[in-house]
Every structure is written in structure tokens, then in C-alpha cells.
Design a protein with these regions (language model features):
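Divalent metal-coordination and catalytic microenvironments
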Residues: 42, 67, 79, 96, ...
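Beta-strand-turn-beta hairpins that frame and shape the catalytic cleft
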Residues: 46-50, 59-63, 172, 176-191, ...
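Pre-active-site segment of Zn-dependent metallo-hydrolases
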Residues: 32-33, 44-91, 132, 209, ...
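Zn-dependent metallo-beta-lactamase
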Residues: 1-60, 188-226, 230, 234
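Active-site metal-binding loops of divalent metal-dependent hydrolases
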Residues: 1-3, 68-70, 97, 123-124, ...
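Active-site metal-binding motif and surrounding structural segment of the metallo-beta-lactamase
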Residues: 73-120, 125-126, 260-270
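Metallo-beta-lactamase
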Residues: 125-228, 323-333
Length: 334
């Protein structure tokens, strides 16, 4: 799921676009859904040991769903187009507790016939408000309900610190031991947990407040401490870093991924970079691009909340690195 769709984009070695026809007929509606939200199905495997059962299920593949979109059924509809069976997923991971990343979760849980791990930072369950710049208007955000999610089959796992996700479970991540991302039998993904803020220009979400459940008072909550990303290590190529919104800042996110893994080479950065919304977000576009050029990933795939202005500047500055995201696209890094 992404904010953008283009049915005419060509496929490439890296990007496989959604099908338009089957058996010499154009596919009937609905078309792929685009919305102001994000969701990614992530499959990680071991090339030298990948084996498949007769039904196509992988013996040795780690499949997770990262975020769930902003509408009730958008991700479900797109999954049907792509032939995705949600029962193949071993974990759902939330990048943070904003509704454009979790609203589709209940519909997804209904389609999973087993208890499923839901991994997130504990602050994802905060009750949050937005106070608008005029100082008068405010709006309460939709929030996650732990008990309702448990009734729907979610096994809630809250983690503040980095963790490794495999088919079998969740484990603490020892810093700078990048061999733990992949062992001889089990492909793993790194979830960063809370991301330290080191840049001066990535300022979080200044309009956000959290509700004190005892007093009802609103407390400034600009950092979005629950914001986290997913990291994979592609052998001989470097890190693939996947962000939901990058409220922590996409540069802070990349720096932390490199620190956690001890790997400096970045192969791809994909997801929301949160450089739209005017003001401080657009002020961060130029320093962000300057730093991205220094980091020098092979691919940049801005999605969701990156925004047109920032995406256009990326195309201008590093056209050879840019890949266009479009909902229902499959990106393959191997």
C-alpha cells in the first residue's frame, strides 16, 4: 500500500508491477488501491538453502506484514490482486501508532486463521491528539485498543529496544553483531525499536500531543518515540532499510541501522521519509538529500509521506538511484 498508483509503469529487474491481464483478458475491477497510508509484505529468505513444498509454501522464508494502511479494506483488496494469503505471515509489525499505518489491521486479522504476533513499541498504544497551528483547533487521532486486538487473535509483543524477528519468534538483538541477521538456517529481520535523534533538522511531529489518562490533560509528544524501521542485510550488497513514516527522520533511521549492524554499506532505502506537510518538513528536504548523497545507497524508493517536492528533488539530484513506488509493486533485492 502506498499513496500513489500508476497502472502503466513498466516492470524491471528490481520492480515487478501488478498484473493487468490474465488469459488474454484485462483484469476486472477493483484496481490496486492507493491511499494516504503504508503497508509492505516483506519476504526474506536464504538463497542457498531456499526450498519449497509442493503447495508453494517456503520451508525457509520469513514473511512479515509491516503496517496495515489507512482504510479498513485497502490492504486486503490489494492482497487479493497479488494472490497473497495472510496465513503465510508469521508476524505483523507496526512502524508506529498512527492510524494511516494500523486502520486495516482488524480486517487483516479476520483473514488469519491462527494467533499472530503483533510487534510494536509500547507507545504505539498512546491516545494522541493533533493541535493545529492556529492554537485553537484540535483533533483526536484514532488509537489502538489492546484488548480488542487480543480478542481478534493478536499476540501483542511490545519492544522498546532492537529485536530480531524470525519465523519462530522475537529475540533481543546484540549490537553490532550483524551475523545474527542471518544464520545458516533462519532468515531474520531487525526491528530497530526507538531511534535516537542526532540530526538538527529532523524534528519529529511538533503538533502531536498525548493524553494523560488520569487527568485528561494533553502533554506535548513531538518525538513519536514509537517510530521504528525494519532492516535486512543483503549478502555482499548491504542494508535494505524500510521505514513507515520516518518520524524519527530518515537520516537518523539510516544512521541507527548502520550503528546497530556495524554495516556501513546501504543497498536500498524504501518507505515514507516524512518530508511533506510544509514548514519544518519541507525545510528538511535539502539537508536530507545532501546526507543521502553522502550515504550513497544503490536505490532510493520514497513512498507515502515523502511528498511530491522531496521526491522531485531526489529525482533531480540522484536520478540513477530513484525507483518509482506504486501500490502493489514488488521490489526484489537479492
Amino acid at each position: 500500500m502506498d499513496n500513489y498508483t500508476d497502472r502503466l509503469l513498466p516492470s524491471s529487474l528490481i520492480a515487478t508491477r501488478p498484473p493487468m491481464m490474465k488469459n488474454e483478458q484485462f483484469l476486472p475491477p477493483p484496481p490496486p488501491v492507493a491511499e494516504h497510508g503504508f503497508s509492505a509484505l516483506i519476504r526474506v529468505g536464504l538463497n542457498d538453502t531456499m526450498a519449497y513444498q509442493n503447495n508453494g509454501e517456503s520451508f525457509n522464508e520469513n514473511i512479515i506484514l509491516f503496517d496495515c494502511g489507512t482504510s479498513e479494506n485497502g490492504v486486503v483488496s490489494n492482497a487479493e490482486i497479488l494472490g497473497i494469503n495472510f496465513n503465510s505471515i508469521n508476524s505483523v509489525i507496526l512502524s508506529h501508532g498512527h492510524f494511516d499505518h494500523f486502520t486495516g489491521l482488524p480486517s487483516i486479522l479476520k483473514r488469519i486463521d491462527k494467533p499472530i504476533r503483533l510487534i510494536c513499541h509500547p507507545d504505539a498504544f498512546l491516545r494522541r491528539w493533533v493541535l493545529f497551528p492556529n492554537g485553537k483547533d484540535k483533533a483526536r487521532m484514532p488509537f489502538l485498543d489492546k484488548e480488542e486486538l487480543r480478542r481478534q487473535g493478536a499476540i501483542i509483543v511490545t519492544k522498546k529496544n532492537p529485536s530480531l524477528i524470525s519465523q519462530d519468534g522475537v529475540e533481543e538483538y546484540p549490537y553490532q553483531l550483524h551475523d545474527n541477521l542471518v544464520d545458516n538456517s533462519t532468515p531474520k529481520l531487525l526491528v530497530t525499536g526507538r531511534i535516537p535523534r542526532t540530526t538538527t533538522y529532523e524534528k519529529g511531529f511538533p503538533l502531536q500531543y498525548k493524553e494523560d489518562l488520569n487527568t485528561g490533560n494533553l502533554i506535548p509528544d513531538p518525538l513519536v518515540n514509537d517510530d521504528q524501521a525494519i532492516v535486512a542485510n543483503i549478502k555482499n550488497k548491504g542494508l535494505v532499510i524500510i521505514s513507515g513514516c520516518a518520524h524519527a527522520g530518515i537520516i537518523n533511521t539510516i544512521r541507527y541501522a548502520k550503528l546497530l549492524t556495524g554495516i556501513n554499506k546501504v543497498y536500498a532505502v524504501i518507505g515514507g521519509f516524512h518530508l511533506t506537510g510544509g514548514g519544518i518538513y519541507e525545510d528538511a528536504i535539502e539537508p536530507t538529500i545532501t546526507e543521502l548523497k553522502k550515504i550513497d545507497p544503490r536505490y532510493l524508493i520514497p513512498c507515502h509521506c515523502t511528498g511530491w517536492k522531496a521526491t522531485n528533488r531526489i529525482i533531480q539530484e540522484v536520478p540513477e538511484k530513484f525507483l518509482q513506488s506504486s501500490t502493489c509493486t514488488t521490489f526484489t533485492f537479492d
